[in-house]
């Protein structure tokens, strides 16, 4: 499935995660704003197919591994609509986002985190060139409990297709 990435519009919000619910795990949600697409800050992009249909979205925020600006890198996430899953869309989208970061920013590393039970995302990240680094214990609150996850990364110097 050929895909492309584009900035959000207000029309996209109801189609994306949580768009149909005013609540999340913590209670009532704040009014959703259209996320920005600036690669140097927190942001997101919509994943679309050839005819412009929304397949899902990518988001990112920066994490810091040291005190200077050179020690920060984006942590990315992906969400796919059910009909887009299992078709290689997530792999293509995450690889495309990594390429954008390495072409347009000076980051050395892009990270991703996924639940230990999310085998599909683990496979997707591996196919996109990410390396598994280890378990992050009790890192994500979901479904009423803290859950373990796996941390993945890809470096600027890692081979990519």
Model regions and ranges:
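Active-site rim helix/loop that mediates acceptor-substrate recognition in acyltransferases
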Residues: 24-50
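Acyl-donor (CoA/ACP) binding surface of acyl/acetyltransferases
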Residues: 1-23, 44, 48-161
């Amino acid at each position: 499935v050929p895909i492309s990435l584009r900035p959000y519009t207000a029309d996209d919000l109801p189609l994306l995660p949580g768009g149909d619910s005013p609540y999340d795990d913590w209670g009532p949600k704040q009014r959703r704003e259209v996320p920005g697409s600036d690669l140097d800050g927190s942001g997101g992009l919509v994943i679309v197919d050839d005819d412009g249909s929304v397949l899902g979205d990518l988001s990112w925020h920066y994490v810091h591994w040291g005190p200077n600006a050179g020690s920060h890198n984006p942590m990315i996430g992906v969400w796919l609509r059910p009909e887009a899953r299992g078709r290689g869309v997530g792999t293509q989208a995450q690889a495309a986002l990594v390429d954008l970061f390495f072409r347009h920013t000076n980051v050395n590393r892009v990270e991703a985190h996924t639940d230990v039970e999310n085998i599909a995302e683990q496979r997707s990240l591996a196919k996109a060139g990410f390396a598994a680094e280890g378990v992050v214990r009790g890192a994500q609150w979901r479904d009423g409990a803290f859950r373990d996850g796996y941390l993945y990364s890809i470096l600027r110097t890692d081979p990519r297709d």
